[in-house]
Amino acid sequence: MLLIPAIDLKDGQCVRLKQGDMDQATVFSEDPAAMARHWVNQGARRLHLVDLNGAFVGKPRNEAAIKAIIAEVGDEIPVQLGGGIRDLNTIERWLDDGLSYVIIGTAAVKNPGFLKDACAAFGGHIIVGLDAKDGKVATDGWSKLTGHEVADLARKYEDYGVESIIYTDIGRDGMLQGINIDATVKLARSMSIPVIASGGLSNMADIDQLCAVEGEGVEGVICGRAIYSGDLNFAAAQAHADKLGAE
């Protein structure tokens, strides 16, 4: 089980939001590259970056911070980025800059043709981010709820060659209420694309539950507020997951 620290970027700083609300941002570091180094030193094997400003305006914003992170750790572990990625030129530029994966969210829902083109052009590098509340997909930085069922949409992406799907339960994100295991497993079982869980990870019990369903197609989990607030020790959690995985 891959535990993936999240570095959410707003105005060049590393922050955490509550339920995607830009007005409820807690700044954890003014040096995102140093934060990236910290998580790698703690045993992270991949990093998850979110360009929050980019997600809201639909084009890259925090470019200096992202490039600094890639320069700091990009040669050591894969780095993935979501937020504001809505055209092929942006994908190409980020991959050329050293990102391993780009995450397409809103654009994958609104423009499946774009997702198909992206997978064809950059196979193996495209992750889809599906954000949902009560099983329904949300877009535009979670500000709009669609009528799409998560599983229906995800199954359509199987033929495209999507690398994995990050499934976020937005009702739980940043609230430390525990991962929605049932919804995550249900999605993973419904298709062949591996799922990365997100939203609400809070303690070792969540890690135990996730490791128990790894065989169902849940390959990782995004770690956010819990590893910043101290509720979860990242190094201990990854070591624990590795131990469970070896049993």
From Swiss-Prot:
EC code(s) of this entry: 5.3.1.16
Gene3D superfamilies associated with the record: Aldolase class I (3.20.20.70)
Assigned keywords, A-Z: Amino-acid biosynthesis, Cytoplasm, Histidine biosynthesis, Isomerase
Gene Ontology cellular component list: cytoplasm
Biological process annotations from GO: L-histidine biosynthetic process; L-tryptophan biosynthetic process
Domain of life per record: Bacteria
Enzyme class at the top of the EC tree: isomerase
Subcellular location: Cytoplasm
Catalytic machinery residues: D8 (proton acceptor), D131 (proton donor)
Coiled-coil positions: none
Database matches in SUPFAM superfamilies: Ribulose-phoshate binding barrel (SSF51366)
InterPro entries for this protein: Aldolase_TIM (IPR013785), His_biosynth (IPR006062), HisA_bact_arch (IPR006063), Isoase_HisA-like (IPR044524), Isoase_HisA-like_bact (IPR023016), RibuloseP-bd_barrel (IPR011060)
Catalyzed reactions: 1-(5-phospho-beta-D-ribosyl)-5-[(5-phospho-beta-D-ribosylamino)methylideneamino]imidazole-4-carboxamide = 5-[(5-phospho-1-deoxy-D-ribulos-1-ylimino)methylamino]-1-(5-phospho-beta-D-ribosyl)imidazole-4-carboxamide
Pathway(s) per entry: Amino-acid biosynthesis; L-histidine biosynthesis; L-histidine from 5-phospho-alpha-D-ribose 1-diphosphate: step 4/9
Example of a GO MF term: 1-(5-phosphoribosyl)-5-[(5-phosphoribosylamino)methylideneamino]imidazole-4-carboxamide isomerase activity
Signal peptide boundaries: none
Family: Belongs to the HisA/HisF family.
Name under which the protein is recorded: 1-(5-phosphoribosyl)-5-[(5-phosphoribosylamino)methylideneamino] imidazole-4-carboxamide isomerase
Organism: Cupriavidus metallidurans (strain ATCC 43123 / DSM 2839 / NBRC 102507 / CH34)
Gene, per the UniProt record: hisA
